[in-house]
Each structure stands twice: as structure tokens, then as C-alpha cells.
């Protein structure tokens, strides 16, 4: 594990000691190198070596998320170059340092062995994200968004800490490798019901569950591009990862307790998809689509079959890359037209034909077209939910149709039609941006050739 953590840590002095004209090149190149090193974690079960120490370990569930985390840092740095170009040099360095610190905390969160350590790191990821949103956001509402973000996440996860300490008292250990062998079965009683709720609520808020999702659109819309990317791609996955890890302690109570949350997720996924259809703000639309995709993941985790677990992990990785590329595209529009309103930035296909291709690919990935891994994840989830209850196929089908509708609506609103007169003199698309989109979409297409590396522990 240290072969990733130490190089990531050393990216900070690299940022501050680089020459002013070399900051972007150095940090991007070295972070890309780190992400290539981390690819070896995906292959660990074909060899004899296990990546396990007393503090950090990596297994097929955390490895794909780990690789996604390291893969996104160079992409975030590439995406942030334009809107930081007018900032003074110390601020650029501080911004990159925040991103590196966030990546470091996320790597340690996904690989923590001890649940209390996991909790501490889970909370620590709030700090850099909050600074990024409230310091570099675009509008003045960013402070409001920061408050929402902090308040929801902290209030949701305080009961989790108390529950973890309680479990520590009962079992005597919170080590993830030991607890699956020593965990006692939780009988159905009032106190255990509250224990289940306390354990799940922190992750449900982070996912977010429909009804607890109000912080997400606010935070997404106000965050700068790197903030939006890391929020959609990785911070939401912390919730799913935590749920997958902690359900093995809470059995067999989950099968009794899951019903209201399953209903809420199934209802919420259709509701948030429908909300997407009437959004005017591009970033807000992508944020609500994130909520709808994560509702599918919650359903999959709560059904608790091997197929649904595989679907949940595949969908988390797929959604991480998809939502990230959509935010990048929205940002490239915003940098040219200085507006996130879709009506004001329409007809861009005539001006930026190459960007239109990226928009088409990203929209098709979002509506889960084969051969992307979004389809793999959604198929697993739909099939496992159908075998749980036949009625869910109606809700799932409706959701898939509405997803297709808003994805195509987003594409048509931004790319088609006659362009408005105020965007005659926009800049062409840069090589940097094309590279950025390619590095997002290539993994999505290539992973469909070998999806077993992202199907998690159950494969």
C-alpha cells in the first residue's frame, strides 16, 4: 500500500518546489505515473502476493475504487488549468495541494483495515472538499452549499461513530479482516434496529439516499470543476463502499430493515430522473442524474445477493467515470459561454464539432448503452432486483426510459439547434480537453472487455 501512499504524499513538496511554468506538467505527469503503479492492485489474485498490512489492505472491492481515485487526480489537474490561469501562483499551488491531500485521504479511506480509522479518514475527506468548494467556487452561494454539505454529512455520520464504538465493545475488534469471522448475528430487537440505522445513516447521506440528497445538487453546482469531479466520482462511492463493508457485520438484520429504504430508493430513482427532465442548469441536471444512479446502487447493496453486489461495484466505477466526464464537458461549455444555462449555450455542434462527439459519447455512456460497463452494472442490478421482487421491473424500466430521455435532452439542448449570437467568437477545443475526455471514456470502453476486475469480492 505504501508504494502509492508515499509517492502521493511526495507530490505535495513537488508542487511547491516546481518552477512556476512547470507546475502543471510535473504534477500531471507524476500523478499519472502513480495511477499506473496502482493498476497492479487489480491483478493481485493472479499472483501469490497479498497486499495486506495491519493498517492498510486491498481486496477486489477496494482495488477498483483505489485505481479510480488515483486515475482521477491527473484528470482533475488537467481540467482545472484554464480557470486557475488568472490566479496568483501560490493559489494555484494551494489548489493542487488540496487535491493531492484529498487523494491521499481517499486512498487511505478505501484501504483502511480498522473501522474507526476508516471513520476518521471518512470524515477527514470533508475538509479539503469543503475548502475547495468554499474557496474556489464560482458564485457567492458556495458558502451556503458548503454549510449544507458539512451539516448533512456530519449529522449523518455522528451516530455511526457511536455505533462503531458499541460494536467494538461487543466484539472486541473492528478489524475488517477479523470481524467477518467473529461477528455475532444481530437478533431483531429495538436496540439493534437503532444500531442498524446508526450504521447505515452516515453512508445513506453520503450516497445520497433520496430525501437526504439536498446537499448534493447545491455542492455540485457551486464547486469548481475539480470539486465536482471528485465529488461525483469518488466521494459518493465512499457511501457505497462503507455500506458494502458494514453490511457483513449487520446480518441478518438487513433483510428485515431494508424494505423502507429499498422502497425509498426505487421511488427516489424515478423521482430524481424526472427532476432531471425539467432542469435548466446543466451542472444541476448532472448532479440529479448522479442521485438517480446511486439509488440503483443502494437498491443493489440492500438486496444482498452476489449478483447485486457485483452490479453495485460495477455501477459505482462506471458512474464515477461517466459523471466525471459529463462535468468536464459542462465545464468546457461554461468556460466558453460563461453560463451553465442550457438554453444560452445551445447549438455548439456547429462551432465545436469534436466536442459534439465527446458529448454524444458521454450521453450514450450515461444512458447505459452497450458496450460500456454502465450496462454491465445496470443489467446485474435489474436482474437481481427482479429476482427479489417481480414488480421492480416496472420501476427499473421506467427509470431506464427516463434516463435515456434526459440524456438525449441534455445532448440536444447543448449541441443541436441554431447557436445564439453571443457565442460567435468562442475558442476552439484544446488538445488538453480532448485528451481529458479520451482518458475518461477509454477506460469505460476498455473495461467492458474484461469486466471481472471491477466486479468486486463476489466474482
UniProtKB/Swiss-Prot annotation:
GO terms for cellular component: mitochondrial inner membrane. It holds the Pfam family Proton_antipo_M. It is an enzyme of class 7 (translocase). One of its GO terms (molecular function) is NADH dehydrogenase (ubiquinone) activity. GO terms for biological process: electron transport coupled proton transport; mitochondrial electron transport, NADH to ubiquinone; mitochondrial respiratory chain complex I assembly. The keyword Membrane applies. The chain crosses the membrane at residues 22-42, 60-80, 92-112, 113-133, 145-165, 194-214, 224-244, 257-277, 284-303, 308-330, 351-371, 393-413, 435-455. It is a multi-pass membrane protein. Its EC number is 7.1.1.2. It is found in: Mitochondrion inner membrane. PANTHER family: NADH-UBIQUINONE OXIDOREDUCTASE CHAIN 4 (PTHR43507:SF20). Core subunit of the mitochondrial membrane respiratory chain NADH dehydrogenase (Complex I) which catalyzes electron transfer from NADH through the respiratory chain, using ubiquinone as an electron acceptor. Essential for the catalytic activity and assembly of complex I. NCBIfam families: NDH_I_M. Belongs to the complex I subunit 4 family. Core subunit of respiratory chain NADH dehydrogenase (Complex I) which is composed of 45 different subunits. This is NADH-ubiquinone oxidoreductase chain 4. The gene is MT-ND4.
Amino acid at each position: 500500500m505504501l508504494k502509492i501512499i508515499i509517492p502521493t504524499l511526495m507530490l505535495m513538496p513537488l508542487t511547491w518546489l516546481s518552477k512556476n511554468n512547470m507546475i502543471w506538467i510535473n504534477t500531471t505527469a507524476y500523478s499519472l505515473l502513480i495511477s499506473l503503479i496502482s493498476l497492479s492492485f487489480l491483478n493481485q489474485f493472479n499472483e501469490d502476493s497479498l497486499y495486506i498490512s495491519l493498517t492498510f489492505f486491498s481486496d477486489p472491492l477496494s482495488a477498483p475504487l483505489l485505481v479510480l481515485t488515483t486515475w482521477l487526480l491527473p484528470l482533475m489537474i488537467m481540467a482545472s488549468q484554464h480557470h486557475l490561469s488568472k490566479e496568483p501562483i501560490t493559489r494555484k499551488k494551494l489548489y493542487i495541494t488540496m487535491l493531492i491531500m484529498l487523494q491521499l485521504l481517499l486512498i487511505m479511506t478505501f484501504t483502511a483495515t480498522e473501522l474507526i480509522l476508516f471513520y476518521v479518514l471518512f470524515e477527514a475527506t470533508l475538509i479539503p472538499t469543503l475548502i475547495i468548494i468554499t474557496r474556489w467556487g464560482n458564485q457567492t452561494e458556495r458558502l451556503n452549499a458548503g454549510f449544507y454539505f458539512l451539516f448533512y454529512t456530519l449529522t449523518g455520520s455522528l451516530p455511526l461513530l457511536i455505533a462503531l464504538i458499541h460494536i467494538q465493545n461487543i466484539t472486541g475488534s473492528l478489524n475488517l479482516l477479523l470481524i467477518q469471522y467473529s461477528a455475532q448475528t444481530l437478533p431483531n430487537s429495538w436496540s439493534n434496529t437503532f444500531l442498524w440505522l446508526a450504521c447505515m445513516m452516515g453512508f445513506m447521506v453520503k450516497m445520497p439516499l433520496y430525501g437526504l440528497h439536498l446537499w448534493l445538487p447545491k455542492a455540485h453546482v457551486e464547486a469548481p470543476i475539480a470539486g465536482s469531479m471528485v465529488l461525483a466520482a469518488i466521494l459518493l462511492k465512499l457511501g457505497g463502499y462503507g455500506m458494502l463493508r458494514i453490511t457483513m457485520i449487520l446480518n441478518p438484520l438487513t433483510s428485515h430493515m431494508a424494505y423502507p429504504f429499498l422502497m425509498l430508493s426505487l421511488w427516489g430513482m424515478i423521482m430524481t430522473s424526472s427532476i432531471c427532465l425539467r432542469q435548466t442548469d446543466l451542472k444541476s441536471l448532472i448532479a440529479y442524474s448522479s442521485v438517480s444512479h446511486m439509488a440503483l446502487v443502494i437498491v443493489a447493496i440492500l438486496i444482498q445477493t452476489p449478483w447485486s453486489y457485483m452490479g453495485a461495484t460495477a455501477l459505482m466505477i462506471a458512474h464515477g467515470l461517466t459523471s466525471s466526464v459529463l462535468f468536464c464537458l459542462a465545464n468546457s461549455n461554461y468556460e466558453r459561454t460563461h453560463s451553465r444555462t442550457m438554453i444560452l449555450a445551445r447549438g455548439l455542434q456547429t462551432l465545436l464539432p469534436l466536442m459534439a462527439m465527446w458529448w454524444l459519447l458521454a450521453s450514450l455512456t450515461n444512458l447505459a448503452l452497450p458496450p460500456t460497463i454502465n450496462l454491465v452494472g445496470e443489467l446485474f442490478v435489474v436482474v437481481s432486483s427482479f429476482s427479489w421482487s417481480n414488480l421492480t421491473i416496472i420501476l427499473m424500466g421506467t427509470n431506464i426510459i427516463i434516463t435515456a430521455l434526459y440524456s438525449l435532452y441534455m445532448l440536444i439542448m447543448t449541441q443541436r439547434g441554431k447557436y445564439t449570437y453571443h457565442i460567435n467568437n468562442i475558442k476552439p477545443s484544446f488538445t488538453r480537453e480532448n485528451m481529458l475526455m479520451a482518458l475518461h471514456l477509454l477506460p469505460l470502453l476498455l473495461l467492458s472487455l474484461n469486466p471481472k476486475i471491477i466486479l468486486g469480492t463476489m466474482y
